[in-house]
Amino acid sequence: MTVEEQFGRNLAYCRRRAKLSQEELAVRASIHRTAVGMIERAERLPRIDTLVKLTGALGASADELLDGLEWEPGDIRLGRFREAAS
């Protein structure tokens, strides 16, 4: 699973747990409604300011949205994200 897919999955889970539609989350986070869908569909990753807005709007922590993402150390060109072991 890619970083985008894992983050999108985490965002969708937190949004559903908060009982919000994508549009409601977008309004609360002051971001465009299509941005939420694009993030959930793994078409883009949020900037750090958007991450902060999303956590505030969801009442979630950044840890929840980043859950399952791990960095595998290495040369800056060779390091990569990997799926966390279950």
What residues fall within each predicted segment?
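Short basic helix-loop element that most often maps to the first helix and adjoining turn
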Residues: 9-28, 53, 79-86
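Short, charged recognition helix plus adjacent turn
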Residues: 66-86
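A detector for short, charged/polar N-terminal pre-domain segments
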Residues: 1-6, 76-77
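Conserved hydrophobic/aromatic packing and binding residues within compact polymer-binding modules
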Residues: 11, 25-26, 36-39, 65
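DNA major-groove recognition helix of helix-turn-helix/homeodomain DNA-binding modules
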Residues: 49-64
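Recognition helix of helix-turn-helix/homeodomain-like DNA-binding domains
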Residues: 30-45
